[in-house]
Every structure is written in C-alpha cells, then in structure tokens.
Swiss-Prot record:
It comes from Schizosaccharomyces pombe (strain 972 / ATCC 24843) (Fission yeast). This is Nucleoporin nup124. The gene is nup124. Keywords: mRNA transport, Nuclear pore complex, Nucleus, Phosphoprotein, Protein transport, Repeat, Translocation, Transport. Residues 263-273 have a biased composition (Basic residues). Contains F-X-F-G repeats. One of its GO terms (molecular function) is nuclear localization sequence binding. Residues 48-62, 106-119, 240-260, 426-441, 480-494, 550-560, 746-758, 815-824 have a biased composition (Basic and acidic residues). Residues 642-656, 863-879, 909-926, 948-963 have a biased composition (Low complexity). Residues 1-28, 44-77, 106-125, 183-273, 426-715, 746-780, 794-1159 are annotated as: Disordered. The modification Phosphoserine is found at residues 211, 380, 465, 546. Residues 1-13, 226-239, 442-453, 528-549, 590-626, 657-672, 696-715, 771-780, 798-814, 830-861, 880-908, 927-947, 1001-1019, 1042-1064, 1074-1087, 1095-1108, 1116-1144 have a biased composition (Polar residues). To yeast nucleoporins NUP1 and NUP2. The keyword Transport applies.
Length: 1159
C-alpha cells in the first residue's frame, strides 16, 4: 500500500517511526511495555482495560491512550504481512476528507466479505462519517431489521434483507421489543468493546458530521429503492450500530463529540438489565415462530419447489413479520446482546442452516412477487440500479410477506397451519417412520427424480413443476426449504427426498421400493449394514454415488425386486450389501468395470464380475446361496445354503478386488491341486470377506470387488487374484475358501490350472460352516496382498471339495492337505495371513481346534508369500504338521514370504516340525517374519529346530539373512542348517549373520548385517538405523547407534543416527558419537554429519572432524575439532530461537492506511 494514507488527521501529529518512544511520555520504555502488554491482554481483560483507557484518554490531549489493540487486523502484522509496529490510532474523531477514506469505505465494504464472522454486527469495520445519500442509502438498505429506516419514519418501507445469520434475526427480535421501551437510554457501548467482539471492527469514534436524522427523507427514499443484499447486510450492520451509537450519544449527552469514557461506569449493570429484559423478549418472539416448540424443521432438499406448501417456513417471512418499526436505540444494544443471545443464535443458525450462498425462496404460491429468489447481490454502493434485476420495488411488501407467513389454512390441507407442528403426531415425522403410513416423504428418499408416492397415493403425484425438468439430470441442485413436515396434506405430496445423491432410479425400481414400505434410508456414510441391498444403480444410469436403499425383506425381494445387480453398478461408492435374490435373476447383466461399492453380488456364471470393485463385496458364489436362505440377508450364507447353491456354475471372478471380497477367500492355501476350486482371480481384491461369504466364495468364486484384471469368465481359467488386497477376517468356515492364488507370480498360471476346477459352490461352504474346519481354513491374510496361499493346488478345487468333503471336516482337511502340497507362495499378502497352509492338523481336528490348527497349519503349508505385508503366519514348515499325517505340504518348504510386511511370525503354537531347512528366507518381510529375508516388522523368527517356523520365541537366534528386515528380526536361526551363524547371540562372529541389507528394526540377530536396525552382532550394516549394540566392532552400523566396543576396525558407519556409544572409532555420522576411541591413537572417524551431540571423548587424538554437528557438539558447530582450540568456529548456524529483535530500519515509515482493515 502507499506509504502515506490520504486521511490527514486533525492533529497534524506525524506518524512516528515504528519503534520511536512516545514523545509525550516521560517513561517511554515503560509506557511502550505497558502498551504492548495491554494490547496483547486486551481481548481478555477488555472490561478493565476499557475503563482505564477511557479515563486515560480524557487526560491526554493527544488521545494516544486509546491505542488500538495490537490484535486488531490493522495492527496484526502477520495478518497484513507487514512487520509488527505499535501504531497509535487515536480515538478522537477525525475530520476526513470526503474523497479520502469515505470513498474507500464504500468501495471496500461492498466487496464480498469472507463469511468468517457469524454475527453481522461484527463484520463491519467502518463507520460512516458521511451521512450523505450514499451512506444513508447503504445503511438503510443494509440494516438487517430496517429498523433504522423505520425509525427514520418510513413505516411503509417493508423491504428487509433476509437476515443472513441468526445474529441479524436477533437484532430484529430485539428491535421488535424496542418500540415500547424507547424510554430506555442505553448509553453507547464503548467502541473498544465492539472491537473486542470483532477484531476487524475499527474503533473509530463517530464523527461530528450531521446526524443521519437530517438526511432522513433522502435515506428513506433511497432505502426503499435498494433491497439489501445479504452480504451487504453482513458487512454493514456494524456500521449501523456505530451510527446509532453516535446519534444516541448526541441526544443523550448533547455533546457533538462523545467519548466512551462518559458512560463506561454503568455499562455492566446496564448490560445485565438489558439481557434480563431481552431474553424474555427473544423467547417470546421465538415462540411466535414456534421455534421453541419441539418442532423439528425438516430441512429437506426439495427437488422441485412445492408452491402450495405453506408448511414451508420462509426465513424472510418470519423476519418480516417479526421486524416492526423500532427505535434506533435498540441498535446500540446489538453489540451488548451478543453474549445473551449467543446460544439462541446458534440454535437459530442450525434451524435455518444459514449459509452465505443459499438462496432462500419466498413462498411462490402465496405471494407471486416473492417468487423471485432473493440472492445475495454484491452491489457497488454507487450503483443504485445494481439490484434492479433481482429485487426492485417489486419485492414483496411487508404485508404480503406477513400474509404469506401468517398461519392460515392451506388449500391442500386446511388443518395445518404453517407454523404449528408441535403435536406428537408431527414429531413422529422426524423419526424413521415405517412407510406403511402414508407420509408425505416419497418412499425412495435417494432418488433425485420425483418419487412416486406410496402406492396408495400414486394417483396424487404432483404434476411436474418446472424444477422437475432439472430432475432428469442425475444431480439436481435442490432448493432448501425448511418445512415442518406434516403428514396430512392430502391433495399433494411433497417430493422431498432426503439428502441423497443418486442417479434417478428407474420407475419400476422406485415403485418396488415404494411398495415395500422401507424405512427411509437416512444419509449415512458408514459401511451399510449387510441388510441393506447394494445401491441399485442401473447400468444405463451409472452414477458415482450410489444410494443404498434399505434392503427389502427376503420375501419382498423374491416377489418383485428387480434391483440392479450390485455387479452392474459401474462406479458405486456405497456400502456393499449382499445382493438380494433378484440378482440371481439378473445374472445376465454385465458387471461394471469399476465399482467402488461394496457390492455383494451373487453372480451367476453368466455375469461378468466387476472389473474393479472397491467395496467389500460379499461376492456370492455363482449359485445364489442367498436365494436359498434368508440368512443371505445378513450377507452370510449359511454354509448349508452355500452347499445348496449350484456348485458348478462357473463365476468369473473380478480380476482385482480391493474390497474384502466375501467371495473366495484368497486364503485357502489349503486347497491342494486336487481341489478344483478356482481361486478367485482377483488381481487386487481389497474386500473384506464375511465368514459366510468365504463359504460362498468356496462354492463360487466371489468376484473380488477390486479385481484389477478382467475377471476370467471361465472359472477354469480364473487365476488366483494377482494382487488381492483383501482384508478378510479369516472365516472359521473359510477353510474351503480358495485363496486368491499368488498374485504376482507365475503361480497364477498354476492357479489357472486350479481354476479349471470351479470352486465347489454350496457344499464346501456348508462343510466349512459345519465344522470348525472353517477355522482351519486359514483366513487368508487379513490384508493379504496376494493371498499368500496362492498355493491352492489344482486338485483342491472347490468343485472337487464339495464332492470330497461331504463332511466339512474331512473335506477341509483333505483339501488342506492337498493344498498344502501345492500351496503356492502368495506373492503379496498384505494382511495378517494366518496361512495354516496345510491345516493338516486341522483336518482331523478341524472342528475342534480351528485357530490353533491354523497356526500349526501355517507351519505346514506356508506358501512363501513373495510379499506378505501382514503378519503372515507362514509356518513355512511343510505339511508334516498336518494332523492327517498327510505331509503333502511337508515336502514343501514353506516359502518365506518374499516381502512380508506384517507380523510374520508363523503363529503356529506348535513349533514347525520341519526345522529351518524348509524355512525360506523372505526376501522382503516387512513384519516380524521368521528369518524373513526382508522383515519389516519385528521378526522373531527363531528357526531353532523347528525350521523356519517363525517360532514366536523372542530369543535372538542366528540371524537369518534378511536382506531387508525392517522390524526387530530376532531371527536367531539356531539351526546350523540354514544359518552359518551360531545361534547364540554371544557368538560375535556368527558366520554371515543374515546379511540384512536393510534391517530397520532392532535386529537382535546375533550377527545380522542389519542395515537399518540395531543389529547386535556387528554385521556390516550399511544402514543400521537402530541401536546397533553389535559386539563385533567390525560391524559398521550405518544408521543406528553403534556400540561397537571393540576399538579395532570400528565399522565405518556411513550414517549412524542414534547415539553410538561405540568404543570403536566408528564415527557416528548422524548420532551423538561418543566414540571414546579407547586407543586414543585410532583416528576418530571423521563424522561428516554428526547430528547429535558428538563429543569424541579423546579430542586430543584426531578428533573427528564433524563436518556438520547439528547438536550440542562440544566441538561447536563447524569446528574442525576440539583439539584445534583456535579451530575456526566455522559458520555459525544458530537455528534455535534468538529472541533478539532488531529495530526497524531507521528510515522507513510504514504508514498503515486506515482502510487496510477492510481488506
């Protein structure tokens, strides 16, 4: 802004330089200090502060005492982007040039203001000093209650802006009561108080310019021309209050210039009286509006305006009716009442959800003139005609509005009055009503299209109103009407869909919905309960947001529910619901490629599954299990039902599902090649599986909602999902579930072989349900990226299984055994996959010990999941564990997950029978994987004799070579077999501790080269990020604190980030390297980047040249070394807080323009 402001002040005091001491004061330092403190504390101690400043300003000629708080936006530097200055704005009224500030005031105030403040009166920073036509016109037009203009004498003017906030409503209410109480002289509230309420409100003293009463006539004429816009209201109401302040003061005190000091003493008592007086008033007025009665206003999106509905409470009408001519004195009270009415304000704001941009429409039918929408207009003050298009003199007059709002019998329902809703009957309308009683609300809440009334009323559906044209579009912009809902309007029904965004439902679907008196679906953003059917989106009208219509009763579904199959929804985002029986009928419908919906689609083989389902879809097996049982409603098909379902129908599985697919549990690594189930091919299923769903999946591959690939239509060909992201909680029944085979690897091809066999549809599920065997079924990893048990062997296909396992236990066990042989490592399991791959033990025990078996099974058939991200309980150990004794899996080495990210401790309670020999190293286990090559979690894989079964034992055995262990991999591979290392951690030199290229966790493996973790043995951990208390001095702990005690070859730790107390000379790059370097002779490693306090203990012998010690490094920041006492303290990087503030540069005077607050 220009450095000089145009307004010259009457006192020609020059603006002081920012930090000059005040000239008038003898103690400049203390006064500045006091001012700073008081300005900071001002908001908190406004009452005390005001009195003091008021009295002070009396004494000081300059008026400097009334300095504005530093917190007012004009003075808050960060607000303005300027450097902080203490600016004194004197409270004395200034004679302002008309062209100077006044122009700015008007032009700026008409700019749209950000809707920061709710109360209008707080918004206007400016006072009008000119009471010429322009200012009065804008004042009158802007005053929310138009009380000013009425006081000025135009009672006939009825144009009142819709109060934008409840605050303005309250102003109107207050002014209502004021005519009687004109006698009340409430002297001005000190303007500081106003600024306190609104920091943007400028504490300008009113000017001596002639009272607005002088230009009364002009203002009245102008005001009648301007319909205030809501924004203007908001920005100006503060001005009105200031103006009225001035006039009242003039009247009361007879002073042309009144300072707030005069009335300060009694303000609090006055305010108290005012509040006591006003609270009853406001509640009276609220009662008039019936707002205090238990009327619940249904704010409903009305897709078409209902012209005849008098039930609709129009805010304008209420305001017009309530606003009666008042004295301007009440305006002065506005600021004071804020506290009294804040609660009421909020309530009102909620009732009329006021938003700046909502257009309220007046009742069109009652009042043809009021039909035009009152939009907030941002009009420049100079332009009187700017509003003309919208609100000219033709705006509804007060009488019209009053007539429109006064309760009078509605033609449609003579009984109802507009404002009375309080009876209990009406209150019921706010509850979910069973739709059996004919309520006004259309049955299908969500459709934006005009909904048919309940079947009884179909004849009465309104003829489409012009707004219905909009309805054809999928998203119609609804009008907001607040209408208390009354049941009784017989002639017309309001089409008031609740807020729902749904492509228009086809008429038949709507009618079906209407017939079934469903409770109105309320807008919920949670996973829909399973009872709700998936959003019915017809394929022809896909929409991004699908509605979840409440699920019909099974009977109804069977009767007539042609709801679009969930699979069809192209992009449904809604919660998944198991599809109803109808879908079975719809099997033909092609599924959409990308449904984000949790669509529980019972897909027939004919339907292609969604390619890209993001929701947790309870994929039903192709045979509609649900059709058989109502249990399906729950989304859980009873296993019996599952068995009932047609086993053979091949169901194409979605190639990739992101949701938990209720369908095939990717997890059934148990399946042996024998089982013919086709693992679902979801490449990427993310869905969570319901237990029943898992059964279903066994019976039929549920398409995983999120398959990335096209589902293979032929079950035979379906490959295990390449990338299943399922969050499936293991079904107890799930043993039959086929697990999506490996995701990433060729294994998918194997699975295709498996796929040939269609998963046994019904019987397996039933078996599973019957037996605990479901427990046996390894829940495929909860977040199985690829269900690790891609190993479902072809034999294990589910079709066979249903045949094999008429009794679920036997079947499951058999399958699992077979599967265990075949269990393919799941390429990418992200969830905690308890892969009890074999479940062999479970076979005999299946029902008895579902969970424990799982753990043991895990041992047996852990497919090595190349990428298990969850705690994959891969008991990599083979099937020998199997209770059956079928060791088919045993021959398998359980592959360790290549990338297990989770807690990959084979949870098997029993140690794997097969010892480390089978344990494969997971190249990348991110969780605790037993000897994972890559464990990212705490891998306590102790391969003692159990083989790689991740014994939960925390003992740090011989480290497996986890290339990437990111967790604490306590993999003490005791077994000589796999690990060259001696299992005891004491062994300093376990042969090649597993060289964990990247161990990020506490790697207690005796000598893992734990790159990132604390590797106790000193492996050459390029990147040890944790405490590496490796006894082996040679182990370079790259990133962790190396406590290499050995002085000899300290690991050259490229990057130790933690305090490395290594006796070794390791130069901890980033940590506090207290390398005591016992042999002082050893050159301390030059730590390029010590970020901690690096105090090399023996500074004398080559102190490490810490290039960049960022901590409290005894050799301070850039010292070459402590030894060089003259060492140049290199660059001083004081990054901490320096409290020194430099003075502003002497030359610059930053004049803060008075008008800047209007920005």
């Amino acid at each position: 802004m220009p450095p000089v402001s145009k307004n010259t002040r009457t006192s020609s005091k020059t603006v002081k330089k920012p930090y000059d001491p005040p000239q008038g004061s003898s103690r400049p330092f203390f006064t500045v200090l006091k001012r700073a403190f008081s300005s900071v504390l001002h908001p908190f101690t406004s009452g005390l502060d005001e009195k003091a400043s008021g009295t002070a300003s009396k004494d000081r000629k300059s008026g400097r005492a009334g300095t504005k708080s530093l917190l007012t936006p004009e003075l808050t530097p960060h607000y303005l982007g300027k450097s902080p200055r203490i600016i004194r704005v004197s409270n004395r009224s200034h004679v302002r040039t008309i062209d100077g500030i006044e122009e700015k005031v008007h032009t700026n105030t008409f700019e749209p203001r950000k809707p920061k403040q709710k109360q209008d009166y707080t918004n206007s920073p400016t006072l009008f000093k000119r009471h010429d036509e322009l200012s009065l016109k804008s004042l009158n037009s802007l005053h929310p209650s138009s009380a000013l203009s009425k006081k000025l004498g135009s009672t006939s003017q009825h144009q009142i802006a819709t109060p934008k906030s409840s605050a303005s409503l309250l102003n109107i209410l207050r002014s209502l009561h004021d005519e009687q109480k004109n006698t009340l002289n409430i002297s001005s509230v000190k303007q500081d108080r106003i600024t306190e309420a609104n920091p943007t409100c400028e504490k300008r003293k009113p000017s001596r310019s002639p009272s607005p009463m002088l230009s009364k006539k002009k203002s009245v004429a102008r005001a009648s021309e301007n319909e205030p816009s809501a924004k203007q209201n908001k920005s100006f109401s503060g001005n009105d209050s200031h103006k009225s302040l001035t006039d009242i003061r003039d009247k009361e005190n007879g002073e042309t210039e009144v300072s707030a000091k005069n009335h300060v003493p009694h303000r609090s008592s006055r305010r108290r009286r005012r509040h006591q007086r006003l609270i009853p008033i406001i509640y009276e007025t609220l009662e008039q509006m019936d707002l205090r009665k238990p009327v619940l206003v249904n704010a409903e999106v009305q897709t078409d305006s209902n012209p005849g509905n008098t039930m609709f409470i129009d805010k304008q009408d209420i305001y017009h009716r309530l606003s009666t001519p008042t004295s301007r004195k009440r305006q002065t009270l506005e600021k004071g009442h804020i506290k009294a009415f804040s609660a009421v304000d909020e309530d009102l704001d909620e009732i009329f959800a006021c938003e700046d941009d909502v257009h309220y429409t007046a009742l069109p039918k009652q009042n043809p003139k009021s039909e035009r929408i009152l939009e907030p207009i941002i009009a420049s003050p100079k332009d009187n005609t700017s509003d003309k298009g919208l609100l000219t003199k033709s705006a509804p007059t007060f009488e019209e509005l009053q007539a429109s709002i006064t309760p009078k019998p509605v033609k449609t329902s003579p009984n109802d009055t507009a404002l009375t809703l309080a009876n209990a009957e009406d209150n019921k309308t706010f509850e979910h009503q069973p739709l059996s009683k004919d309520t006004e609300a259309p049955k299908s809440q969500f459709s934006s299209s005009p909904t048919k009334e309940s079947t009884t009323r179909k004849s009465e559906v309104e003829p489409p109103s012009p707004s219905k044209e909009i309805k054809s579009s999928h998203f119609s912009v609804p009008e907001f009407k607040f209408e208390p809902k009354t049941e009784a309007t017989t002639d017309k029904k309001l089409n008031v869909p609740k807020f729902e965004f749904k492509p228009t439902a086809t008429a038949d679907v709507q009618t079906n919905r209407l017939k079934e008196n469903e409770p109105k679906p309320t807008f919920f953003a949670q996973l829909p309960s399973k009872t709700q059917e998936t959003p019915s989106i017809t394929e022809n009208k896909p929409s991004f947001f699908s509605q979840l219509s409440p699920k019909r009763e099974e009977t109804e579904k069977k009767d007539n529910a042609p709801s679009a199959p969930a699979s069809t929804s192209g992009f449904s985002f809604g919660g998944f619901a198991p599809k109803t029986l109808e879908e079975k009928e719809e099997t033909k419908a092609p599924t959409f490629n990308f449904s984000l919906n949790n669509a529980s689609s019972t897909q027939d083989t004919t339907k292609p599954t969604l390619q890209f389902n993001f929701g947790s879809s309870f994929g039903k097996p192709t045979s509609n299990i649900f059709n058989d049982k109502k249990t399906s409603e729950n989304g859980l098909a009873s296993s019996t039902v599952a068995s009932e379902s047609k086993p053979s129908a091949p169901e194409s599985k979605p190639s990739s599902g992101f949701g938990n697919t209720a369908g095939s549990s990717p997890f059934s690594f148990n399946l042996t090649k024998e089982s013919k189930e086709v693992p679902p091919t979801n490449s990427f299923s993310f869905a969570k599986k319901g237990k029943d769903e898992a059964n279903d999946s066994l019976s039929a591959k549920a398409s995983t909602p999120f398959s990335f690939a096209k589902p293979n239509t032929e079950n035979v060909t379906t490959t295990a999902p390449q990338f299943s992201f399922n969050f499936t909680k293991p079904n107890t029944d799930a043993k039959t579930n086929l697990l999506p085979e490996k995701t990433f690897n060729e294994e998918a091809v194997k699975q295709k072989e498996t796929e040939k066999e269609v998963p046994p549809t019904g019987p397996k599920a039933s078996e599973i349900k019957d037996s605990v065997s479901s427990n046996n079924a390894v829940p495929s990893s909860t977040f199985n990226f690829v269900s690790p048990f891609a190993a479902v062997s072809e034999k294990t296909n589910e079709n066979n299984i249903p045949n094999d396992t008429t009794k679920t236990n036997g079947n499951a066990t058999k399958r699992t055994l077979e599967q265990t042989e075949d269990a393919k490592p799941f390429a990418f399991s992200f969830g905690s996959t308890t892969e009890q791959a074999n479940k062999k033990a479970s076979t005999s025990n299946e029902t008895t010990k579902p969970q424990l078996d799982t753990s043991s099974k895990t041992d047996g058939v852990t497919a090595n999941a190349p990428f298990s991200f969850a705690s994959a309980f891969n008991a990599p150990k083979p099937s020998t564990n199997t209770a059956d004794g079928k060791d088919s899996a045993s021959n398998l080495t359980t592959p360790s997950p290549a990338f297990s990210f989770g807690n990959n401790s084979g949870v098997k309670a029993s140690s794997n029978n097969n010892p480390s020999t089978n344990s494969s190293t997971a190249p990348f286990s991110f969780g605790t994987s037993n000897k994972p090559a890559f464990s990212f979690g705490s891998a306590t894989s102790k391969t003692t004799s159990e083989g790689t079964a991740p014994a939960a034992s925390a003992s740090a055995p011989a480290p497996t070579t986890s290339a990437f262990s990111f967790g604490a991999s306590n993999s003490s591979m005791n077994k000589e077999e796999n690990t060259p290392m001696a299992k005891d951690a004491g062994d300093t030199a376990p042969a090649s501790g597993f060289k964990s290229g990247f161990s990020f966790g506490a790697n207690n493996s005796p000598q893992p080269a734990s790159m990132f973790g604390t590797s106790t043995p000193a492996p050459s951990s390029a990147f040890a990020f944790g405490n590496q208390s490796g006894t082996n001095p040679a182990a370079p702990a790259g990133f962790g604190g190396i406590t290499n005690t050995a002085t000899n070859n300290p690991p050259s730790t490229g990057f130790t980030f933690t305090p490395s107390n290594a006796g070794s000379t390791a130069a901890p790059m980033f940590g506090a390297g207290n390398t005591p370097n016992p042999s002082g002779s050893i050159n301390n490693a030059s730590q390029a980047f010590a970020f901690g306090s690096g105090e090399p203990s023996n500074p004398a012998s080559n102190p490490p040249s810490t290039g960049f010690s960022f901590g409290a490094a005894t050799p301070s920041a850039f010292n070459a070394s402590a030894s060089q006492s003259p060492a140049p303290n290199g660059i001083q990087f004081n990054l901490g807080s320096s409290n020194s503030q430099t003075n502003a540069p002497p030359g610059r005077k930053i004049a803060v323009p008075r008008s800047r607050r209007k920005r």
